[in-house]
Curated annotation (Swiss-Prot):
The protein's assembly and partners: Part of the 50S ribosomal subunit.
Protein's name in the database: Large ribosomal subunit protein uL22
Record field: compositional bias (Basic residues): 84-95
GO biological process: translation
GO MF annotation list: rRNA binding; structural constituent of ribosome
Xref: InterPro entries: Ribosomal_uL22, Ribosomal_uL22_bac/chlpt-type, Ribosomal_uL22_bac/org-type, Ribosomal_uL22_sf
HAMAP family, per the entry: Ribosomal_uL22_B
SUPFAM superfamilies per UniProt: Ribosomal protein L22 (SSF54843)
Upper classification of the organism: Bacteria, Pseudomonadati, Campylobacterota, Epsilonproteobacteria, Campylobacterales
Gene: rplV
Biological role stated in the UniProt entry: This protein binds specifically to 23S rRNA; its binding is stimulated by other ribosomal proteins, e.g. L4, L17, and L20. It is important during the early stages of 50S assembly. It makes multiple contacts with different domains of the 23S rRNA in the assembled 50S subunit and ribosome. The globular domain of the protein is located near the polypeptide exit tunnel on the outside of the subunit, while an extended beta-hairpin is found that lines the wall of the exit tunnel in the center of the 70S ribosome.
GO CC field: cytosolic large ribosomal subunit
Pfam families associated with the record: Ribosomal_L22
Family stated for the protein in its record: Belongs to the universal ribosomal protein uL22 family.
Amino acid sequence: MSKAIIKFVRLSPTKARLIAREVQGMNAELALASLQFMPNRGAKFIANAISSAVANGGFEPEEVVVTSCRVDAGPVLKRFRPRARGTASKIRKPTSHVMVEVSKPEKKEA
């Protein structure tokens, strides 16, 4: 089993979790292929984490399975936008931590 962590990704954790759920349990090669054609911005970051986890373990993508794909919330960058009548409103720029674990599938005994 090997893992990869990408921290402080400028992406909302709720949007990234939608993609992470799709990939969990998939073959790594199939997951990378499906992420390549997803229109979401977070798909690129999760694909990078999967390929990094595969490389960290010294595996080939076709021989491993994505056992766990987690997206945790990171710190929120707070900014202000000027508004009417001299007021200001808050802008929240959320960040995420992407954690991916890959391992070889266990052989089922018949």
